[in-house]
Amino acid sequence: MAEITASLVKELRERTGAGMMECKKALVEANGDIELAIDNMRKSGQAKAAKKAGRVAAEGVILARIGAGFGVLVEMNCETDFVAKDAGFLGLANEVADYALANKGVTIEALQAQFEEKRATLVAKIGENMNIRRVQFLDGDVVGSYLHGAKIGVLVAGKNADEDLLKKIAMHVAASRPEFVKPEDVSADVVAKEREIQVAIAMESGKPREIAEKMVEGRMKKFTGEVSLTGQPFVMDPAKSVGEFLKESGADVTNFVRFEVGEGIEKVESDFAAEVAAMQKI
């Protein structure tokens, strides 16, 4: 039985867009063969199989705004990275973010309706599909933000902290992609699924189920730490956990939001050879 490492799971997550649990299970079933795992996930519909259909707006930008006691993230999409850097597109995206800041709690439907005329005009001018995809607000005593190249946006809410400290935590969230704030926040169903996977791994090595179940208890504590913010090694000082850094600072994190451009959207597979052949005919 091949060892299912964290780096292998991370690579599969990045390549398929599937969740951590699905990726671990697929790797176990494929005995650590990532290419086989991807094939199996595509067959079962877990992975987002690339399709040549439609004009998918999967590029774009993430914008962040901070108000009094809250923050907001907005994602606006277009078809190509080239247009994502266009002044007209960025101008509209910033208008949308400013409007969301000034109208706390606005729904995505209301936001889309507010800017539909401008969006349609810009689509006609540039010739690419684009849309306001999502908006999310985060309340907190203090809220910090971080944008990574306009492709990843994070908001972090905390107590007894300043925006600079929360920005550092937001940078960690951008890089390490935690799913929960604290280990105790990991839901029972997520823990149960992981336990079954770990038991299956132990049983594959020849251990009886009773022994395997006892073996995985220690692994479960490690797992809940890996998927939670406070349990992860702090990216700015890996010798300590985020939780230890916060404790030393006398601060606490209450919640966070992480957006990444295009996550969850099926991107059109580009056939480079066909594109080159088509260009030769022009």
Curated annotation (Swiss-Prot):
The lineage of its organism: Bacteria, Pseudomonadati, Pseudomonadota, Gammaproteobacteria, Pasteurellales. Residues 80-83 are annotated as: Involved in Mg(2+) ion dislocation from EF-Tu. One of its GO terms (molecular function) is translation elongation factor activity. Its main location: cytoplasm. InterPro entries: EF-Ts_dimer_sf, Transl_elong_EFTs/EF1B, Transl_elong_EFTs/EF1B_dimer, Transl_elong_Ts_CS, UBA-like_sf. Keywords: Cytoplasm, Elongation factor, Protein biosynthesis. Associates with the EF-Tu.GDP complex and induces the exchange of GDP to GTP. It remains bound to the aminoacyl-tRNA.EF-Tu.GTP complex up to the GTP hydrolysis stage on the ribosome. The keyword Cytoplasm applies. The keyword Thylakoid does not apply. This is Elongation factor Ts. It is found in: Cytoplasm. GO terms for cellular component: cytoplasm. Belongs to the EF-Ts family. Gene3D superfamilies: 1.10.286.20, DNA helicase RuvA subunit, C-terminal domain (1.10.8.10), Elongation factor Ts, dimerisation domain (3.30.479.20). HAMAP family: EF_Ts. Pfam families: EF_TS (PF00889). It comes from Pasteurella multocida (strain Pm70). It comes from the Bacteria. CDD domains: UBA_EF-Ts.
